Curated annotation (Swiss-Prot):
Keyword match Transmembrane helix: no
Residues found modified as Phosphothreonine: 5
Top-level lineage group: Eukaryota
Its biological purpose: Non-catalytic component of the methylosome complex, composed of PRMT5, WDR77 and CLNS1A, which modifies specific arginines to dimethylarginines in several spliceosomal Sm proteins and histones. This modification targets Sm proteins to the survival of motor neurons (SMN) complex for assembly into small nuclear ribonucleoprotein core particles. Might play a role in transcription regulation.
Protein name per Swiss-Prot or TrEMBL: Methylosome protein WDR77
GO aspect biological process, one term: oocyte axis specification
Length: 342
């Protein structure tokens, strides 16, 4: 395993305190989501999960090392409720899953100092827990604690289809990066469904989640169009080929629930897994651990790989930390018997 090395930081003197006029004065404590943009800018979603109101906010940092310091953000905006999930729509659109039950689309202005609301639609009857943009970039999928999945036309600002195929709360949806009509969903009914919206019966059940533990997170392999990975409430991560009946590989990675999974942009991609055990694990193609960080002091909620530096992985959590991890640029060979212990 690799030891953690802190990334080079931009000297504080080189940064300029310049809070945009419409940005909130203070970021909520719980960081729920993080996404790098193609140019290396970092988007954060924050929530306040205490008190009488569940507030939330969105923040853009052109310098990711300055996050989560509000004074160094490029743009920020208060949301009506907590942010459960978010994702980029192109380079300027931001799709948000809200604790209010709304799916929200926000957009950066031309100067990227304002985040402007494009729509806020209350089509779900409970917290929207997850959103994902289909590979076309014009449609998206949302999943909610109301057991429903909805397919959206973002340009028309409307729901195209609504499905109630799960008999429990939907915990994750993941659009295929390879096919614009295909996505995955999982829920608290202990099922993983493979969807193809072109079919008369669009959902088919994957027979890989019969462990008795609820699936909590999903992601597609970036290069193999029939392969995906899921994590469960027990901390197990499993690799699945949709063309075969069961799991190809499984590994108990965490001691608590898996909260997020994301593949790296490497030619042989790493898999980052984050968890309620407050740790980050990075796995190779065989789900063997190559890196572990326990730097967070509360639930780790999301991870995102830098598009500019493939060795840089950023995590956020409920401890209000944005932590940058440096990894090897490519997977390492298996260690020999004389390798020094960490």
């Amino acid at each position: 395993m690799r030891k953690e090395t802190p990334p080079p930081l931009v000297p504080p003197a080189a940064r300029e305190w310049n809070l945009p006029p419409n940005a909130p004065a203070c970021m909520e404590r719980q960081l729920e989501a993080a996404r790098y943009r193609s140019d290396g800018a970092l988007l954060l979603g924050a929530s306040s999960l205490s008190g009488r109101c569940w507030a939330g906010s969105l923040w853009l940092f052109k310098d990711p090392c300055a996050a989560p310091n509000e004074g160094f953000c490029s743009a920020g905006v208060q949301t009506e409720a907590g942010v459960a999930d978010l994702t980029w729509v192109g380079d300027r659109g931001i799709l948000v899953a809200s604790d209010s039950g709304a799916v929200e689309l926000w957009e950066l202005d031309e100067n990227e100092t304002l985040i402007v609301s494009k729509f806020c639609k209350y089509e779900h009857d409970d917290i929207v827990s997850t959103v994902s943009v289909l590979s076309s970039g014009t449609h998206a999928v949302s999943g909610s604690k109301d057991f429903c999945i909805k397919v959206w036309d973002l340009a028309q600002q409307m729901v195209l289809n609504s499905y109630r195929a799960h008999s429990g709360q939907v915990t994750c949806v993941a659009a295929s990066p390879h096919k614009d009509s295909v996505f995955l969903s999982c829920g608290e009914d202990n099922r993983i469904l493979l969807w193809d919206t072109r079919c008369p019966k669009p959902a088919s059940q994957m027979g890989c989640s019969a462990s008795g533990y609820l699936p909590t997170s999903l992601t597609w392999h970036p290069q193999q169009s029939e392969v995906f990975v899921f994590g469960d409430e027990n901390g197990t991560v499993s690799l699945v080929d949709t063309k075969s009946a069961g799991c190809a590989v499984s590994s108990v990675v965490h001691s608590q629930c898996v909260t997020g999974l994301v593949f790296s942009p490497h030619s042989a991609p790493f898999l980052a897994s984050v968890s309620e055990d407050c740790s980050l694990a990075v796995l190779d193609s065989g789900l063997s651990e190559v890196f572990r960080s326990r730097a967070h002091r509360d639930f780790v909620r999301d991870a995102t790989w830098s598009p500019l530096n493939h060795s840089l992985l950023t995590t956020v959590g409920w401890d209000h930390q944005v932590i940058h991890h440096i990894l090897p640029t490519e997977p390492l060979p298996e260690p020999g018997p004389k390798s020094a212990a960490e």
